[in-house]
Amino acid sequence: MQPIEIYTSSTCGYCFAAKRLLNQKGVSYAEINIQMEPERRAEMITRAAGQSSVPQIFIGTQHIGGCDQLFNLERSGKLD
């Protein structure tokens, strides 16, 4: 599987849910916490075509979207 990056914040329930799903599947990912690294927020918004909410999830260079989209991939068997 291509590298996964997930932009998060420390207090985001959807971020915790997305990370929990990835952890349960044994998938490694790079977490970018925009509260700890606020300078990365602009990068996230640019990469996510203007989306400013977290989580924003990328698999390789493809923008997946947020938590709902990640769970949709899981339901359709595309995270395996």
Where are these regions (language model features)?
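Thioredoxin-like thiol-disulfide oxidoreductase module
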Residues: 34-52
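Short, structured active-site "lid" loops
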Residues: 46-66
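Non-catalytic, surface beta->alpha helical segment in thiol-disulfide oxidoreductase systems
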Residues: 59-80
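Glycine-/small-residue-rich active-site loops that bind phosphorylated ligands and cofactors
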Residues: 13, 36, 64
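Amphipathic alpha-helical interface surfaces
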Residues: 18, 40, 66-69
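Local sequence-structure signature of Cys/Sec-based thiol-disulfide redox active-site neighborhoods
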Residues: 1-28
